[in-house]
Amino acid sequence: ATAVEKLPCPDCNSRQSLQVFLNRDEALGLDFYSSFCFSECWEAKGDPYNGGPAPEVYVKTKEDIANELKTAKSCPIFNLRSNYRGIPIEYFKSWGCRQFLSEFDGTTPYAIGFPLSLEGELVGWKARPLRKKDFFGIGKTSGVDPFGLERAWPLATDTLWITEGEFDAIALDYCMTLAGKSKMYPVISLSHGGGSINKNLSLIRDRLIKRKIKNLVLVLDDDEVGKLAEKAALRLWDNVYIVSKPGLAKDANDAVLFGYEIEMGKLALGFKND
């Protein structure tokens, strides 16, 4: 099968998580399309074109991408007037998040942008509109390092905490600062949910070893995708610890929204006792 393009998933609404493939049936001499959602659904979705031809896709040039990155970097640091998703705004600032503005009036906050890097270089942004559950990419968004990796390196000694989403990473950092003694912690988020853990850990494995990272602490979603990701990590790394969530929270951001910030922080910091 040949990868064709990435589309929004119609079921979980994740942007660019539906990978389309072109397949060849040699016995019948026919080509056909199939797809798979690598985000929350984590399942095959069939032909996204319903038997029709694939639309022509414009391939962005390096100049196009460079201009997009320049525009994104010119946007202000994320700075809403109140907490967002229960997290104090200053935490978003410390993670380098940008505030993308409405293209209609140029002043109304429209989306939050999460910086994406590869080997230390800023290569793209993952953006989420403030008023709906959706994502869109700016610049390079595939084949990138986990969100927060460059931030984590100078903070890490022998332990790295891993979440399944950008909001969860920032929320977990917030929780641990309340429960612990440090002002910042080495937390990263998988680039495309739990289904990307194999790809992410394989991409950064040599750097983890070089920097003498010993423990990987997983604070993933309490769902099927999260459980599969935990099993995958246990096959890829020797010292993997799985942290439970307090109360009815299914992830770190839930813990914040439910008022379990300190409890979540204590569980994450006490990973060897969980």
Feature locations, PLM:
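Residues at the starts of beta-strands that form the adenosine-phosphate
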Residues: 186, 215, 239
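Short, surface-exposed amphipathic charged segments that create phosphate/polyanion-binding patches used
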Residues: 110-111, 201-207, 250-266
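A charged alpha-helical hairpin associated with nucleic-acid processing machineries
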Residues: 244-247, 264-274
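Phosphate-handling DNA/RNA-contact segment within nucleic-acid enzymes
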Residues: 104-211
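Non-catalytic accessory segments of DNA primases and related replication-initiation nucleases
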Residues: 1-111, 119-142, 223-227, 231, ...
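A generic structural motif
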Residues: 190-193, 240-251
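Acidic, metal-coordinating catalytic cores used for nucleic-acid/nucleotide bond scission
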Residues: 167, 193-198, 220-230, 247
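Acidic beta-strand-to-loop metal/phosphate-binding motif
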Residues: 162, 211-225
